[in-house]
């Protein structure tokens, strides 16, 4: 990997991928929509080039892909914009092919797997999405894998669970930390008794960059699981205890979400995804750990402590 481009570098995964590339001395282009956000994240890094571009536009994507050999695609959209995922992938792949990019890595989540058929979900688990958003994510994956099969470039998919941590305030978990620090009641979607897993977002950067650096890891999908299986209730309790507060939270179920959806477009998108909170979706990353000789995972106690410390320094 001589030079990489991070598509979606303004997000939390992209930020920590960029920090790891810089740590390794690998030149990279940080691409996102907002120049000020990118400059804040990467402007002082010696190996970073900041490019503000509209990645839904062919010209913007072409500018972003020019002169790099590897694209690490971490671009995300809101729930109300999910139909854009396949379109954005087509634009990025066209740009990559035209620019002669050699490798294209997609970072995604667990939606394409659907409801688990096994206790742990390995890369060989069938992809049978049960939600429209899962179907759109599967379509995105299929487009990339088909490009790899056609020989346009080498491809890879890395799947992550829900994450939390510094700069991840758009995640499901981070608002709970904010509520705990303020002594307020946290909101959660769905039941809290189900086993879940969470990834401390800084842990993702080194793993993604290591995979991207290895030619023998392409042509495959890789799971990177969270620190451990934990009930959402236990996770929330740990957050409040670390903040020195008594746990306070409320949950919204399917009926409440449908009512809220009458007034809020985002809430309208949530009921179909409740299966992720009602059924344990726990990744099996034995293949990845075996390939890389292990992978560092920050414990929940340590990750929660670091996240609270970061939020105290970044109160908004």
Segments the model singles out, each with a brief description of its role:
Residues 1, 210-270, 285, 290-291, ...:
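Mid/C-terminal beta-alpha module of Rossmann-like enzyme folds, strongest
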Residues 4-26:
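N-terminal Rossmann NAD(P)H-binding glycine-rich loop of SDR-like oxidoreductase domains
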Residues 36-99:
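NAD(P)H-binding glycine-rich loop region in Rossmannoid oxidoreductase-like domains
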Residues 90-136:
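Conserved Rossmann-fold NAD(P)-dependent oxidoreductase catalytic core, especially the SDR/UDP-sugar
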Residues 130-157:
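Active-site Tyr-X1-5-Lys
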Residues 150, 157, 161-195, 239:
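NAD(P)-dependent short-chain dehydrogenase/reductase
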Residues 197-204:
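A conserved structural motif in NAD(P)-dependent oxidoreductases
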């Amino acid at each position: 990997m001589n030079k990489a481009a991070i598509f979606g570098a303004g997000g939390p995964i992209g930020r920590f991928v960029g920090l790891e590339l810089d740590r390794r001395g690998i030149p990279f282009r940080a691409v996102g929509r907002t120049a000020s956000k990118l400059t804040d994240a990467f402007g002082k890094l010696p190996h970073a080039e900041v490019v503000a571009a509209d990645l839904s536009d062919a010209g913007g994507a072409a500018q972003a892909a020019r002169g790099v050999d590897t694209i690490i695609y971490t671009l995300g959209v809101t729930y109300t914009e999910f139909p854009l995922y396949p379109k954005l992938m087509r634009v990025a792949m066209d740009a990559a092919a035209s620019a002669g990019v050699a490798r294209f890595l997609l970072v995604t989540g667990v939606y394409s797997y659907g409801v688990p058929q096994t206790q742990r979900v390995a890369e060989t688990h069938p992809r049978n999405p049960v939600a429209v958003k899962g179907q759109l994510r599967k379509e995105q994956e299929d487009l990339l894998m088909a490009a790899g099969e056609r020989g346009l470039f080498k491809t890879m998919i890395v799947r992550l669970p829900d994450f939390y941590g510094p700069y991840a305030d758009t995640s499901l978990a981070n608002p709970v930390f904010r509520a705990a620090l303020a002594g307020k009641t946290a909101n959660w979607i769905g039941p809290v008794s189900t086993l879940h897993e969470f990834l401390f977002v800084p842990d993702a950067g080194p793993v993604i960059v290591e995979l991207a650096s290895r030619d023998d890891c392409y042509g495959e999908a890789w799971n990177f699981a969270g620190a451990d299986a934990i009930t959402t209730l236990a996770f929330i309790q740990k957050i409040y205890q670390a903040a020195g507060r008594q746990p306070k939270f409320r949950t919204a179920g399917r009926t409440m979400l449908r009512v809220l959806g009458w007034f809020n477009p985002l809430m309208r998108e949530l009921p179909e995804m409740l299966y992720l909170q009602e059924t344990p979706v726990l990744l099996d990353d034995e293949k990845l750990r075996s390939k890389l000789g292990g992978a560092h995972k920050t414990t929940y106690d340590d990750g929660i402590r670091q996240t609270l410390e970061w939020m105290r320094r970044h109160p908004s």
